[in-house]
Amino acid sequence: PGPDVKCVCCQDGEECPCKGGECCITGTCCKEGDGLCCGKCSNAACKCADGCKCGSGCSCTLGNCTC
């Protein structure tokens, strides 16, 4: 894996492609210059139920979800 390897990570319920692999564990890839957020969170590192607002009905199954 080179420096241009991408993985899909989640922050604030959004998917974002970014370089490296740690973001897939920490769920923080939407920092400035890191990547562009796009779409709903569906990656294994941070998976939330559809429409999750982090309330009583929130089901965040894996990772550091910040719905």
UniProtKB/Swiss-Prot annotation:
It comes from Sphaerechinus granularis. Pfam families: Metallothio_6 (PF05522). It comes from the Eukaryota. Keywords: Metal-binding, Metal-thiolate cluster. Signal peptide: none annotated. Coiled coil: none annotated. Belongs to the metallothionein superfamily. Type 4 family. Metallothioneins have a high content of cysteine residues that bind various heavy metals. One of its GO terms (molecular function) is metal ion binding. This is Metallothionein-B.
